[in-house]
Amino acid sequence: MPFRSNNPITRDELLSRFFPQFHPVTTFNSGLSGGSFLIEHQGQRFVVRQPHDPDAPQSAFLRQYRALSQLPACIAPKPHLYLRDWMVVDYLPGEVKTYLPDTNELAGLLYYLHQQPRFGWRITLLPLLELYWQQSDPARRTVGWLRMLKRLRKAREPRPLRLSPLHMDVHAGNLVHSASGLKLIDWEYAGDGDIALELAAVWVENTEQHRQLVNDYATRAKIYPAQLWRQVRRWFPWLLMLKAGWFEYRWRQTGDQQFIRLADDTWRQLLIKQ
């Protein structure tokens, strides 16, 4: 149920107006990019979410609601309410583990997602790379960063192998191991893009695991594994730049030292992979 209002409301106003019988259960972190809180009434639970990035346009939050509205409940939480700065979605019971599931199981989930109707908006990385450069701490901007940005701008993004709806933030913390199978949460970066971009963006433990995931996916998608892996590798510089830039952006936004450490580590990976 979308509810349009130009005036933001407080948490207490949200609960009293739309969920008067529900009460907050606990507050929990949803990964690096923000938090949510849980509400409950007679065993029914919802997650109340706010935009992770307070500086992001409201349209980005609305896109997340629209993506969840069209996705099947077997892979994503169903949304119940959207209004400015707030979204209420189903709570997905299950276990969130600290490591990825079996690569074949994960490949099956991603392949099923990629068979769904497209969302209707494209993921384009270059505008994000440029935004993160512009919004980063000037003292952290380097000649090497600018050189790499110009190189990618000139090269342009790889031509999609297959265009599908993507989650774009697949890591252990966003996977719920439920009784009915794997499900994905935290869809803030969802959009249409290359299936190889999704596979390249998965937060894997090592190259061997990455190759196995790509091979398992290729079997399901009836693509030559070597062809798919080549396409995945084409996205690596883009994704490493995206991660590094995002960490730099979040460092300036929050002052949290963990983002500097993550940025420095990603810059080192980028130099290795060049």
Swiss-Prot record:
It is an enzyme of class 2 (transferase). Its EC number is 2.7.1.89. SUPFAM superfamilies: Protein kinase-like (PK-like). It catalyses: thiamine + ATP = thiamine phosphate + ADP + H(+). Keywords: ATP-binding, Kinase, Nucleotide-binding, Transferase. Pathway: Cofactor biosynthesis; thiamine diphosphate biosynthesis; thiamine phosphate from thiamine: step 1/1. GO terms for molecular function: ATP binding; thiamine kinase activity. It holds the Pfam family APH. GO terms for biological process: thiamine diphosphate biosynthetic process; thiamine metabolic process. The keyword ATP-binding applies. Transmembrane segments: none annotated. It comes from the Bacteria. The keyword Kinase applies. Gene3D superfamilies: 3.90.1200.10. Belongs to the thiamine kinase family. Catalyzes the ATP-dependent phosphorylation of thiamine to thiamine phosphate. Is involved in thiamine salvage. This is Thiamine kinase. It comes from Escherichia coli O157:H7. The lineage of its organism: Bacteria, Pseudomonadati, Pseudomonadota, Gammaproteobacteria, Enterobacterales.
